[in-house]
Structure formats: C-alpha cells, structure tokens
UniProtKB/Swiss-Prot annotation:
Subcellular location: Cytoplasm; Nucleus
Gene giving rise to this polypeptide: Id2
GO cellular component term, pick one: nucleus
Domain bHLH as annotated: residue spans: 23-75
Induction details: Expressed in a circadian manner in the liver with peak levels seen at CT12 (at protein level). Expressed in a circadian manner in the suprachiasmatic nucleus (SCN) of the brain and heart with peak levels seen between CT16 and CT20 in the SCN and between CT8 and CT12 in the heart.
Main function: Transcriptional regulator (lacking a basic DNA binding domain) which negatively regulates the basic helix-loop-helix (bHLH) transcription factors by forming heterodimers and inhibiting their DNA binding and transcriptional activity. Implicated in regulating a variety of cellular processes, including cellular growth, senescence, differentiation, apoptosis, angiogenesis, and neoplastic transformation. Inhibits skeletal muscle and cardiac myocyte differentiation. Regulates the circadian clock by repressing the transcriptional activator activity of the CLOCK-BMAL1 heterodimer.
PANTHER family hit by this protein: DNA-BINDING PROTEIN INHIBITOR (PTHR11723), DNA-BINDING PROTEIN INHIBITOR ID-2 (PTHR11723:SF5)
Posttranslational modification: Polyubiquitinated; which is favored by Ifi204 and leads to proteasomal degradation. Ubiquitinated in a ASB4-depedent manner, leading to proteasomal degradation. Phosphorylated in vitro by CDK1, PKA and PKC.
Pfam families: HLH
Cystine pairings recorded for this chain: none
Modified residues (Phosphoserine): S14, S25
Ubl conjugation is among the record's keywords: yes
Keywords attached to this entry: Biological rhythms, Cytoplasm, Developmental protein, Nucleus, Phosphoprotein, Repressor, Transcription, Transcription regulation, Ubl conjugation
Protein name, UniProt field: DNA-binding protein inhibitor ID-2
Length: 134
C-alpha cells in the first residue's frame, strides 16, 4: 500500500519522471538480480587485476578473494620492506608488529607461487610486516 500526500504536487505542469526516462534507483531488495550481476562484474574485474589468478581456468569466488588477500598482503610486505618505510618503522617505538600468517593453500598454483616467493631476496621476505587482518 502506498501512502499519498494530501498536498498537491508543485510540479503539475512538468513532465513526469517516467516520460523523461528518469527512474529512481532500486535498492538491492527491489532488484536482487541487478546486485548479483554487479557483484559478478566485480569478481571478474578482481580476477583480471590479480596476477596470481589463472585467467584461462575457472576459479570460485572464494578462491578469487583468497588470491586478492594474498596479493594485498604480498604488496604490503614489499612496501614495508622498502628502505624508506623500514626507517619510518624504526622511528616509531612501541608499535606491535607481528609476522604474517599465511592463508591455506588453495591449489597447485598457490603452491607454485609459494615456492617462487622463497627465491626472492631476504629483504623482501621480512618478518617485520604489519598484519592487515586480525
């Protein structure tokens, strides 16, 4: 049931929103399929942007999210190990810095990436990184 206002609209001579092609945006409750398509587009974009996700292989949404988390944490480690950032960390005493807890290996691709990561110079694999997820 819709509520009606006892006051007449001031816009009686104007064109209706419908005739102008203007519509109110629907909430996700009004249009769940639109939300689903939008989320699928976001997952597709994430799959394109993260280099460790195989492009020619079907991966689940959970795998995409885990790859994204790993990628962000790896970028954080690389950033934290940069000499300028390292010197800033030493200037802030009392900061609690814990080592990163790795996520569960999803598939062979992740295992291969882990083996490749062990070949990086030790300054990139510092244990002084900040934990992003508690």
């Amino acid at each position: 049931m819709k509520a009606f206002s006892p006051v007449r609209s001031v816009r009686k001579n104007s064109l209706s929103d419908h005739s102008l092609g203007i519509s109110r945006s629907k909430t996700p409750v009004d249009d769940p399929m639109s939300l689903l398509y939008n989320m699928n587009d976001c997952y597709s974009k994430l799959k394109e942007l993260v280099p460790s996700i195989p492009q020619n292989k079907k991966v689940t949404k959970m795998e995409i999210l885990q790859h994204v988390i790993d990628y962000i944490l790896d970028l954080q480690i690389a950033l934290d190990s940069h000499p300028t950032i390292v010197s800033l960390h030493h200037q802030r005493p009392g900061q609690n810095q814990a080592s990163r807890t790795p996520l569960t290996t999803l598939n062979t691709d992740i295992s291969i990436l882990s083996l490749q990561a062990s070949e990086f110079p030790s300054e990139l694999m510092s244990n002084d990184s900040k934990v992003l997820c508690g």
